[in-house]
């Protein structure tokens, strides 16, 4: 009887030890799983700034919030972008180091293929990056239609087939009109400055014939260079580019007389 009771005692003790070991394993496994879950759910306090040239992912989740300082964007996990470009609902924004959207003019490093530091313009109210032609404080500027950086210099702008050349100030970027003497570089390394004329109304570079301040001028096709000291058909463009009329000129050893329409009436 005693032996039987002792056997039952040890058998139960063995079972209890196994249960405790199993329970301990479950406890530690549960603790580890909880730790992993906790680590993966910890909200980030800051986001990485995209490197220049990195393509942005379009975000639609989150909430716009406006406070006394300005607008900022809050993600579902409570984090918010700062010191970086963001594409939200297909529009581009730049968030400053406090997380607020940038408005007006800002010099920044590009966010996609354009890696240079350039000027950008953000809507004064909404903060979205502007593209294409923009009238700002009475002046016209042109921003890349895809990446938004301000263009400078002589640029061909417009849809295929109707593109025209414009002169955007090399520093300020505002569209220029009227007369400008601009450089043209050739394949042999030579650079020559030519007079060109940009329409006072829409700023496009003029080609062909144009009457300016009462005088006729001719500008070459393709380059828009003012013709000078040269014949164009039956008309003669003087050194200053004006078409000869109502006068007699000595040209290559001969005297040419021009009527009021610029037609040669006599040669001596």
Label each PLM-derived region with a short phrase.
Residues 3, 8-268:
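Extracellular adhesion/carbohydrate-binding repeat motifs centered on closely spaced tryptophans
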């Amino acid at each position: 009887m005693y032996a039987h009771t002792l056997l039952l005692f040890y058998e139960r003790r063995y079972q209890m030890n196994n249960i405790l070991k199993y329970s301990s394993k479950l406890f530690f496994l549960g603790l580890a799983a909880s730790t992993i879950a906790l680590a993966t759910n910890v909200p980030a306090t800051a986001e990485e700034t995209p490197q220049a040239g990195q393509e942005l992912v379009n975000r639609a989740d989150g909430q716009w919030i406006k406070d006394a300082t300005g607008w900022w964007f809050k993600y579902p996990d409570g984090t918010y972008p700062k010191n970086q470009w963001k594409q939200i609902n297909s529009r581009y924004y730049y968030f400053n180091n406090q997380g607020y959207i940038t408005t007006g003019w800002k010099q920044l490093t590009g966010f996609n293929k354009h890696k240079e530091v350039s000027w950008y313009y953000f809507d004064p109210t909404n903060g979205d990056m502007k593209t294409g032609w923009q009238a700002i404080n009475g002046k016209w500027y042109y921003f890349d239609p895809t990446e938004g950086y301000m263009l400078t210099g002589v640029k061909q702008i417009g849809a295929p087939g109707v593109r025209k050349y414009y002169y955007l100030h090399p520093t300020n970027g505002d569209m220029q009109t009227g007369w400008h003497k601009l450089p043209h570089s050739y394949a042999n390394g030579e650079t020559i400055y030519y007079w060109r004329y940009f329409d006072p109304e829409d700023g496009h570079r003029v080609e062909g014939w144009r009457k300016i301040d009462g005088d006729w001028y001719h500008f070459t096709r393709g380059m828009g260079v003012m013709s000078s000291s040269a014949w164009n058909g039956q008309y003669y463009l003087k050194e200053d580019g004006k078409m000869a009329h109502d006068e007699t000129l000595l040209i290559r050893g001969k005297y040419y007389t021009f009527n009021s329409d610029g037609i040669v009436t006599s040669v001596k």
